[in-house]
């Protein structure tokens, strides 16, 4: 199991590339083919499933190492990756709703349609980072949680766990985990490029010309966009400090997941309105306007609570109740320790007894 764990981690990070389109239709040795190994109707679901398999490589590494640091690191990593996979999956649901497919190639093609504002063709590609900004932001945040990179590298933080779940590894298995980490970073960047940045399609305003937006040019655009996301990974590592573990988990469960659920409901409702043609019904628009005004009024007036009502009175606190000292909580008051003297008091008493010597 100890030797199998890094192999599982390495295979999981490479498998996702089989369904990521690197380019469109190209001519190769007299044959026309796509720059993609395979495309299945549930390609994005396959990517999420493979990412979940990578967690087993981390858990098995910590369990088989028989070390405290390794076990704690693997538990942290598994909890972190599972928590942020939920928010990541919810952020991708809106992409499925807009594109109408889970196929990676069809999602890229759906982003090639131009944005039309008031009947005017802007010639700007409808990339989902622009149409689905909340989903894009949530995916970028969860991307760091999935890759265990700063500011979310809590399973490997040197100040607490030495090297985390890879503390007991050396040589080739140790290098395999580092390879898996950086390949996973490239995989997440490629998925971000495919689902939100238009994939192999040329960016605006280069998409005006069909010459540089087809054939082998797609490989260049895909590579440049992926490198841009990888650069963002490196920049964040150098610019943002590490999160505390409880803050990190609160961000995932109390912020990202509720926001993702609310955003999915909003997008689904909006698409239903467009498909049913309710947007041209004045009665429907009036009802929606009244509901929005009521929500805004409730948020600014009725949603406020009295902060003083939740404050509990100060309570006495025994720091040694569990057998070892623990710090008091904000609403607890630590009782004075009987017979305890500080080092300064003892030194002053000895100084007085010796006559100032």
What name fits each language-model region?
Residues 1-357:
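Selective transmembrane helix interface/packing segments
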């Amino acid at each position: 199991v100890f030797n199998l764990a890094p192999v599982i981690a390495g295979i999981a990070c490479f498998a996702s590339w089989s369904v990521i389109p690197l380019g469109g239709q190209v001519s190769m040795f007299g044959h026309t083919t796509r720059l993609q190994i395979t495309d299945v109707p549930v390609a994005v679901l396959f990517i999420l499933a493979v990412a979940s398999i990578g967690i087993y490589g981390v858990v098995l590494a910590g369990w088989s190492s028989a070390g405290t640091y390794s076990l704690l690191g693997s538990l942290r990593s598994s909890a972190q990756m599972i928590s942020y996979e939920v928010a990541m999956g919810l952020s991708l649901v809106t992409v499925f709703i807009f594109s109408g497919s889970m196929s990676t190639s069809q999602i890229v093609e759906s982003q090639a349609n131009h944005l039309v504002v008031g009947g005017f063709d802007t010639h700007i590609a409808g990339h989902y980072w622009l149409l689905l900004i909340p989903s894009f932001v949530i995916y970028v945040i969860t991307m760091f949680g999935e890759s265990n990179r700063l500011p979310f590298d809590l399973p490997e933080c040197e100040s607490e766990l030495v090297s985390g779940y890879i503390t007991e590894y050396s040589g080739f298995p140790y290098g395999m985990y580092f390879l898996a980490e950086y390949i996973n970073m490239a995989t997440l960047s490629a998925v971000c490029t495919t689902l939100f940045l238009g994939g192999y399609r040329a960016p605006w305003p280069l998409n005006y010309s069909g010459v540089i937006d087809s054939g082998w040019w797609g490989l260049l655009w895909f590579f440049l966009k992926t490198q841009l996301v990888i650069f963002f990974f490196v920049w964040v590592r150098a610019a943002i400090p590490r999160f505390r573990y409880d803050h990190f988990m609160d961000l995932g469960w109390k912020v990202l997941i509720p926001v993702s659920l609310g955003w999915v409901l909003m997008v689904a409702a909006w698409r239903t309105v467009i498909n049913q043609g309710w947007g041209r019904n004045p009665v429907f628009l009036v009802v929606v306007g009244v509901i929005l005004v009521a929500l805004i009024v409730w948020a600014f007036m009725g949603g406020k609570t009295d902060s003083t009502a939740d404050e509990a009175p100060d309570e006495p606190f025994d720091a040694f109740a569990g057998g070892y000292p623990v710090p008091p909580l904000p609403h607890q008051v630590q009782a004075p320790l009987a017979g305890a003297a500080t080092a300064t008091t003892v030194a002053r008493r000895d100084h007085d007894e010796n006559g100032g010597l």
